Amino acid sequence: MSLRESIAKNITEVLGDMDPPRPVFVTREPFDVEKLALTQFPALLIVTANETREEHTMGGNRRAVLEILINGFVRSDGREGFVQSVDEKRNEMIERVEETLNEDRTRELADSTAVKTRVTNIEVIQDRKPPLGEFVVTCEVHYTFTTTTT
């Protein structure tokens, strides 16, 4: 399995197992958020994005920075009274995602060394109409690995 895949799987598993409030639906397969059942919120879509690589040492060691996009979707039930707003639910889920990623920044990689995982950007998507809310958390995983020569 590639290191990109190992990192993406680890992040998907970790976010699926995080402490409450936790997402109900965590996947790497794109989906139509409009077709999710009320019971499938909050939902997260994990996507591997850009990666930069550079030589680290002459012995075939390289450094890489992999971007992971965590697309989050929340839903307010729209009732009056003591119910969280879309903004409150979105902020709470963003905080839980960041806290969970910070619990183990190494991503438990066997074939390389993950130097660090860090959140670099949080974007609130304004195009969603209530009761839906959307955000994208961008995180970077910095790691080193050894290339094989043939």
Question: Where are the language model's segments positioned?
Answer:
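Charged, amphipathic alpha-helical segments and their flanking helix caps
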Residues: M1-Q40, T48-T150
